[in-house]
């Protein structure tokens, strides 16, 4: 058995895997005219040649993808200041901009990149002319410069530059919206290339498709990757032994644990938000039913029963209930089951089918695949009012996965007859596509905060 595993499947530890620059290239397909204007001024480079990473471009792209910001193109900026004293506040506010990011990069004595950046409130700067004052602890009137919202310096290696740019995006996003940014997160997904020696590959990349790493490759299908809450493990379904099995793998060491290998179907793993339990779907007794495995004791509890098929479990934020897809009413719809008393309630009513549901981190909405006269598209349902909003116009949407801050959704769709990954903001106003260069891409899973 072990020999066959080794011949069939390679587990590749991330530290030694091949890294691609951007196997998934994000292409914006629909922007937002009404998003908040912001100025991301090109960072000044005090050195020879070009910087290994265009920090300001990365920040600008991050904020634009959030759907909440509309970065001003460099050629339309009234100026490109690098110091606070150089800022013409009025010129920026006339454009409707209320905040800008400026920065500088230089090499320090240790050969590292010293990155300095500021987030500046240009409205406050215009009002105070950058000279606001207040009393300090001793009662002395001092210059506060409170229009500078963030002022930070970091010393970085070449490999750290792109990651730090995402960190800046997170800081700016949270400071201006009050919500945590999700730009330092990853996505896991399955790439299928029928012509490859190992057609099925489980990969991980930064949320924007960069720094892709191969985690696992197989001659048999890999399905349904799901992140653990600590971002260190993936649960997934493998057919490496000519039958479906559920594994949990540490993405850093490659160590695996077999969780389920029952007769017939083993699928749809999903970690609870505390990481203690794993919801899975088995058909060992006939129809598809949902079970919960305690990962410490390995005790398994059956959650659903009956003749209907019940699948695609997803945990509520409080871990006290699950939503799932069931055909008990004739066609797939989404239900909620209380894990305490087993009571079940149907949640979706609009559309002939609703499936693949996930609950937003704040517990207010379900994001799901909704079937209507126009096809299969992503939709969002308000759990309090029941109101449904269709978010996408792409073809044959499936496998939605919500960013940990609830601001974006990644999913699989069809583009030019190929499975590709797409993104949509939670309000449906911003859309982007991440076409792969080497195969069909399916089953995306957005990581937790890292």
UniProtKB/Swiss-Prot annotation:
Location within or outside the cell: Periplasm
Keywords: Cell cycle, Cell division, Periplasm, Signal
Main location: periplasm
This protein's record includes keyword Transmembrane helix: no
Family: Belongs to the TolB family.
Function according to Swiss-Prot or TrEMBL: Part of the Tol-Pal system, which plays a role in outer membrane invagination during cell division and is important for maintaining outer membrane integrity.
Quaternary data: The Tol-Pal system is composed of five core proteins: the inner membrane proteins TolA, TolQ and TolR, the periplasmic protein TolB and the outer membrane protein Pal. They form a network linking the inner and outer membranes and the peptidoglycan layer.
Protein name: Tol-Pal system protein TolB
The organism of origin for this protein: Aliivibrio fischeri (strain MJ11) (Vibrio fischeri)
Name of the coding gene: tolB
């Amino acid at each position: 058995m072990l020999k066959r595993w080794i011949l069939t499947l390679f587990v590749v530890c991330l530290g030694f895997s091949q890294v691609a620059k951007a196997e998934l290239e994000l292409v914006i397909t629909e922007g937002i005219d009404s998003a908040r204007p912001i100025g991301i001024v090109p960072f000044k480079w005090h050195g020879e040649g070009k910087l290994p990473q265009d920090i300001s471009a990365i920040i600008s792209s991050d904020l634009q993808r959030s759907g909440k910001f509309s970065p001003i193109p460099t050629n339309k900026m009234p100026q490109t200041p690098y110091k606070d004293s150089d800022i013409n506040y009025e010129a920026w506010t006339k454009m409707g901009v209320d905040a800008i990011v400026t920065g500088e990069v230089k090499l320090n004595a240790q050969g590292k990149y010293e990155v300095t950046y500021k987030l500046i409130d240009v409205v406050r700067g215009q009002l105070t002319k950058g000279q606001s004052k207040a009393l300090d602890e001793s009662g002395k009137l001092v210059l506060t410069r409170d229009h500078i919202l963030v002022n930070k310096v970091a010393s970085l290696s070449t490999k750290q530059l792109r990651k730090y740019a995402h960190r800046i995006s997170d800081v700016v996003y949270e400071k201006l919206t009050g919500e945590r940014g999700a730009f330092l997160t990853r996505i896991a997904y399955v790439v299928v290339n029928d012509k490859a020696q190992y057609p099925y590959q489980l990969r991980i990349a930064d949320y924007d498709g960069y720094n892709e790493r191969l985690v696992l490759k197989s001659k048999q299908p890999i399905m349904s990757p799901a992140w653990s809450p600590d971002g260190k493990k993936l649960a997934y379904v493998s057919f490496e032994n000519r039958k479906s099995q559920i594994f949990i793998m540490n993405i850093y060491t490659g160590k695996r644990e077999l969780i389920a290998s029952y007769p017939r179907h083993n699928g749809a793993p999903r970690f609870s938000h505390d990481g203690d339990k794993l919801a899975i779907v088995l058909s060992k007794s006939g129809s598809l039913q949902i079970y919960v495995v305690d990962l410490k004791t390995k005790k398994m509890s059956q959650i659903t029963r009956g003749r209907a098929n019940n699948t695609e479990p997803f945990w509520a934020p409080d871990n006290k209930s699950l939503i799932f897809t069931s055909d008990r009413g004739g066609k797939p719809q989404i239900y909620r089951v209380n894990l305490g008393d087993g009571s079940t309630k149907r949640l979706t009513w609009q559309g002939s089918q609703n499936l693949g549901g996930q609950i937003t981190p704040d517990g207010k909405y379900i994001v799901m695949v909704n079937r209507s006269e126009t096809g299969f598209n992503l939709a969002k349902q308000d759990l309090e009012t029941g109101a449904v909003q269709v978010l996408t116009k792409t073809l044959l949407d499936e496998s939605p996965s919500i960013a940990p801050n609830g601001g974006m959704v990644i999913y699989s769709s069809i583009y030019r007859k190929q499975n590709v990954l797409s993104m949509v903001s939670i309000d449906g106003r911003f859309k982007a596509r991440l076409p792969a260069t080497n195969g069909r891409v399916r089953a995306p899973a957005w990581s937790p905060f890292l």
